[in-house]
């Protein structure tokens, strides 16, 4: 019949080729393909794991830098706090010492006034005078050991950080703003002002002499003396 499909021609060569390929070779090819697929799967897993570890490492490194910065700030804040505490303790200690010494300085003033005003007559009066002057010397020695030094202000340029002006008056001897008289002695304590000196200040006119604010530096312990301390005219000292 004309409508039937043509029957494929018999190809003896093809049949021979198929027959020539062993079944073992086909199985080997399929096995190699399976092994290749099995090996590629762990490799992909390792790459994914490596990427994950790199991300975790990057995250940990950022966290480390953040914590390190926080630690450095905390360490700096603590160091500043420690220094501030040390300064505050030093200031408090200085204020306590100043408060105590401020109560003692009027006693020193009274000793000095007595030394200037009293003129003992007779052996008994002079012995008594030497006795309390000995006490005064002991007091002065203790103050020096604590770092107390007296100011020398007459002839120096007025300095409000060291001096307290009680009055201003004309002077033909001193230029303007130069201390002309000390009314109450001032003192340093280890280089810091313990008590301001009460002074009179010149209004001028006067010769422009070499007055200088050298009183800004405390007297050296080897040369600083309290008022009248080394006066050879006084007996027993």
From Swiss-Prot:
A molecular function GO annotation: protein homodimerization activity
Predominant cellular place of this UniProt entry's protein: cytoplasm
Compositionally skewed regions (Polar residues) per UniProt: 27-40
Biased composition (Low complexity): 204-218
Listed GO CC annotations: cytoplasm
Keywords, ordered alphabetically: Chaperone, Cytoplasm, Stress response
Region named Disordered: 1-52, 200-237
Domain of life: Bacteria
Keyword Ligase: no
Record-linked InterPro entries: GrpE, GrpE_coiled_coil, GrpE_head
Similarity comment: Belongs to the GrpE family.
Role summary: Participates actively in the response to hyperosmotic and heat shock by preventing the aggregation of stress-denatured proteins, in association with DnaK and GrpE. It is the nucleotide exchange factor for DnaK and may function as a thermosensor. Unfolded proteins bind initially to DnaJ; upon interaction with the DnaJ-bound protein, DnaK hydrolyzes its bound ATP, resulting in the formation of a stable complex. GrpE releases ADP from DnaK; ATP binding to DnaK triggers the release of the substrate protein, thus completing the reaction cycle.
Designated name of the protein: Protein GrpE
Organism: Prochlorococcus marinus (strain MIT 9313)
């Amino acid at each position: 019949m004309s409508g039937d499909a043509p029957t494929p021609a018999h190809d003896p060569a093809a049949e021979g080729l198929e027959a020539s390929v062993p079944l073992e070779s086909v199985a080997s090819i399929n096995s190699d393909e399976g092994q290749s697929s099995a090996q590629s799967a762990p490799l992909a897993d390792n790459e994914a794991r490596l990427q994950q570890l790199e991300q975790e490492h990057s995250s940990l490194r950022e966290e480390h830098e953040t914590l390190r910065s926080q630690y450095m700030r905390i360490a700096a804040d603590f160091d500043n706090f420690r220094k501030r505490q040390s300064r505050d303790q030093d200031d408090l200690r200085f204020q306590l010492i100043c408060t105590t010494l401020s109560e003692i300085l009027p006693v020193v003033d009274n000793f000095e006034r007595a030394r200037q005003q009293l003129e003992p007559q007779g052996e008994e009066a002079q012995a008594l005078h030497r006795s309390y002057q000995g006490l005064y010397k002991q007091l002065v020695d203790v103050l020096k050991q604590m770092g107390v030094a007296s100011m020398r202000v007459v002839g120096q340029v007025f300095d409000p950080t060291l001096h307290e002006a009680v009055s201003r008056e004309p002077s033909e001897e001193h230029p303007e703003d130069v201390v002309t008289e000390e009314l109450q002695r001032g003192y340093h304590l280890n280089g810091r002002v313990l008590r301001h000196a009460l002074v009179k200040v010149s209004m001028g006119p006067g010769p422009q002499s070499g007055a200088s604010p050298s009183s800004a530096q405390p007297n050296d312990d080897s040369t600083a003396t309290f008022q009248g301390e080394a006066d050879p005219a006084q007996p027993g000292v």
